[in-house]
Regions:
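Hydrophobic alpha-helical
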Residues: 1-41
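Short beta-strand elements at the ligand-binding edges of bilobed clamshell
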Residues: 42-56
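Residue-level detector of short coil/turn "hinge" positions at structural boundaries
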Residues: 24, 50, 75-76
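Flexible loop/hinge segments that line or gate small-molecule binding clefts
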Residues: 35-44, 89-97
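Hinge/cleft segment of the Venus flytrap/periplasmic-binding protein
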Residues: 54-100
């Protein structure tokens, strides 16, 4: 098993695994973090097994929160963003929904 701390690292590892004559996603199970479009494309191709989403769309919410704090406006105590764990089996269905 190979665990990559981000999808770009996993995609690089996939290239290295292929160059070594192995089949990524089959000979070596690959798990990564981020949930970016490239990871879903790799899963759809059978080269990546799972990606755990780290949603970057939280950034704009946090920026608004910071602006509200500076402006001394009331703010929520907790801000959440939806994230998920995506196995390769759902990659083709989820790929069109990727915003990043």
């Amino acid at each position: 098993m190979l665990f990559a701390h981000n999808d770009d690292m996993a995609i690089g590892a996939i290239q290295a695994i292929e160059e070594a004559g192995l089949k990524p996603g089959q000979d070596i199970v690959i798990i990564s973090i981020d949930g970016v479009r490239g990871a879903f494309e790799a899963m759809k191709a059978g080269k990546l097994n799972v990606t755990v989403e780290c949603n970057p769309l939280l950034g704009p919410q946090l920026m608004r929160l910071a602006q509200d704090v500076v402006a001394k406006k009331p703010v929520e105590k907790r801000i959440t963003v939806e994230e998920g764990v995506f196995p390769a089996e759902v990659a083709a269905k989820e790929l069109p929904n990727r915003k990043y």
